[in-house]
Design a protein with these regions (language model features):
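Alpha/beta catalytic cores of nucleotide-metabolism and tRNA/nucleoside-modifying enzymes
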Residues: 1-21, 161, 285, 307-332, ...
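Bateman/CBS regulatory modules and CBS-like beta-alpha motifs in cytosolic regions of diverse proteins
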Residues: 23-39, 46-48, 77-115, 122-124, ...
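Active-site-adjacent beta->alpha loops and helix N-cap segments on the catalytic face
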Residues: 25, 73-83, 141-145, 189-209, ...
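Short beta-strand/loop segments at the ligand-binding rim of alpha/beta enzyme cores
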Residues: 38-44, 91-96, 211-220, 259-274, ...
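Catalytic cores of alpha/beta
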Residues: 55-58, 228-236, 274-292, 332, ...
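Glycine-rich phosphate-binding active-site loops on the catalytic face of alpha/beta enzymes
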Residues: 62-77, 186, 238-250, 288-306, ...
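Short beta->alpha transition motifs characteristic of CBS
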Residues: 69-74, 117, 121, 128-144, ...
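Catalytic beta/alpha-barrel core
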Residues: 69-72, 98-99, 119-121, 159-161, ...
Length: 481
């Protein structure tokens, strides 16, 4: 019998407090998603079909994190989800939606409804700006067969030239009391658009995680051999791909990773793994971040069904030991129940954590809403559950093409308590991590990793750590018993 090591998870250990002059409100939570992509908070929403579609991804990016859109959908639908995130706000919209003057108001309504916008620039056949169609122009129009050119606000309009800053644009829009500012070149060709909505969101969400074009960042999951999906997602503007598998240390994953890095310019996160050897092999094949965790999730049964996995603390420690030598970020995926678990993962060297169950109960998640015994819940299932595998995740568990009645699940379907908005949940998690860093005297995540010291605790120590000897009469927003 070969026992490699004693393996621990979050509840087996505590961090020891240190002398500190650091206040929680003063710490920095900036971190990295991948080798090249920054995060303003170290939180990622999981690529699960009851956790992340465009609404969750938008909410996460606005708060400074990122969402990974799941792949249990056809390529076109996943691309649309990415596009919705990318078009939800921009500093400058470099590829604005436009319409021609000869089109009807009915055509314009289809465009504004589809993209959820309140107005659209009007151009001629050469791309020259000739007007703009706004809510005010169409508010009292009942004849949708009218031509756009007969109703629009015609030139001259207030415009700006390419290169204007957002601060200058804001001043110009305030001066002229307009909500949309077309960007044109010297020949009056439409090149972009700035909206007051985007400027307001910039003020409302100062920590938003954005790309170089001022668009919210978003990731997307892909499976083995899905190069066509990867190409379409990259064209749609995805910031990172997550090559997702229950066993990331497999030949097919390594081959797919090498193919993607050879043919596309995009950061690739790869997982899931738990060993030093796996981490080394993924980095050698081109991984820009390594995702860690086999079996720690609340809805995952891999460790029971297959007898395989590793407690999450030891898994993180294994992988960080290798990845840190190559300056490759590690993502701790699964097993997070409390904000203290997040702090422990970061102190072990993870650059960020991936959250599933805690976000599945939020308003923005795509899971079904339900009421059971008078309490509000949302559906939540593992990607290894029968329901998820029949929808498209069976390849993650090496069962692609298997009939539904022959699938061997490695996850369950259930429900989690409704937890309000994503922002409410992230606020509590961020607050807990800030508090932990204050106890540790760590001004940033790197200092937390460098300075943290741990003690292993007994079952009695764990019992003492939780609420005990009292009946809870009012639930706390960050403690679930």
């Amino acid at each position: 019998m070969r026992i490699l090591q004693r393996a621990l998870t979050f509840e087996d250990m505590l961090m020891v407090p240190r002398k500190s002059s650091v206040l929680p409100k003063d710490v920095s939570l900036k971190s990295r998603l991948t080798k090249n992509i920054r995060l303003n908070i170290p939180f990622i929403s999981a690529a699960m079909d009851t956790v992340t579609e465009h609404k969750t991804a938008i909410a996460m990016a606005r708060l400074g994190g990122i969402g990974i859109v799941h792949k249990n959908m056809d390529i076109q639908t996943q691309v649309k989800e990415i596009t919705k995130v990318k078009k939800s706000e921009s500093g400058v919209i470099n590829d604005p939606i436009f319409i021609h003057a000869h089109r009807t108001l009915a055509d314009a309504k289809v465009i504004t409804d589809n993209y959820k916008i309140s107005g659209v620039p009007v151009v001629d056949d050469k791309g020259l700006l000739i007007g703009i169609l706004t809510n005010r122009d169409v508010r009292f129009e009942t004849d949708l067969s009218k031509k756009v050119g007969d109703v629009m606000t015609k030139m001259p309009l207030v415009t700006a030239h390419v290169g204007i800053s957002l601060d200058e644009a804001s001043d110009l829009m305030h001066k002229h009391k307009i909500e949309k500012l077309p960007i044109v070149d010297k020949d009056n060709v439409l090149k972009g658009l700035i909206t007051i909505k985007d400027i307001q969101k910039r003020i409302e969400y100062p920590e938003a995680n954005k790309d170089d074009f001022g668009r919210l960042r978003v990731g997307a999951a892909i499976g083995v051999g899905q190069l066509d999906r990867a190409e379409m997602l990259v064209k749609a503007g995805v910031d990172a791909l997550v090559l997702d598998s229950a066993h990331g240390h497999s030949a097919n994953i390594l081959h797919t990773l090498e193919e993607i890095k050879k043919s596309l310019v995009v950061d690739v996160i790869v997982g899931n793994v738990v060993t030093k050897e796996a981490t080394s092999d993924l980095i050698s094949a081109g991984a820009d971040a390594v995702k860690v965790g086999i079996g720690p999730g609340s809805i995952c049964t891999t460790r029971i069904v297959a007898g395989v996995g590793m407690p999450q603390v030891s898994a993180i420690d294994n992988c960080v030991g290798v990845a840190s030598k190559f300056d490759i970020p590690v993502i701790a995926d699964g097993g997070i129940r409390y904000s203290g678990d997040v702090a422990k993962a970061l102190a072990l060297g993870a650059s960020s954590v991936m959250i599933g169950s805690l976000l599945a109960g939020t308003e923005e998640s795509p899971g079904d809403f339900m009421i059971y015994q008078g309490r509000q819940y949302k559906s939540y299932r593992g990607m290894g559950s029968i329901g998820a595998m029949t929808k498209g995740s069976s390849d993650r568990y090496f069962q692609e093409g298997v009939a539904s009645e022959k699938l061997v699940p490695e996850g369950i379907e259930g429900r989690v308590p409704y937890r309000g908005k994503v922002s409410d949940m992230i606020f509590q998690l961020v607050g807990g991590v800030r508090s932990s860093m204050g106890y540790q005297g760590a001004k940033n995540i790197l200092e937390l990793y460098q300075n943290a010291e741990f003690v292993e605790i007994t079952s009695a120590g764990l019992k003492e750590s939780h609420v005990h000897g009292v009946d809870i009469t009012k639930e706390a927003p960050n403690y679930y018993g």
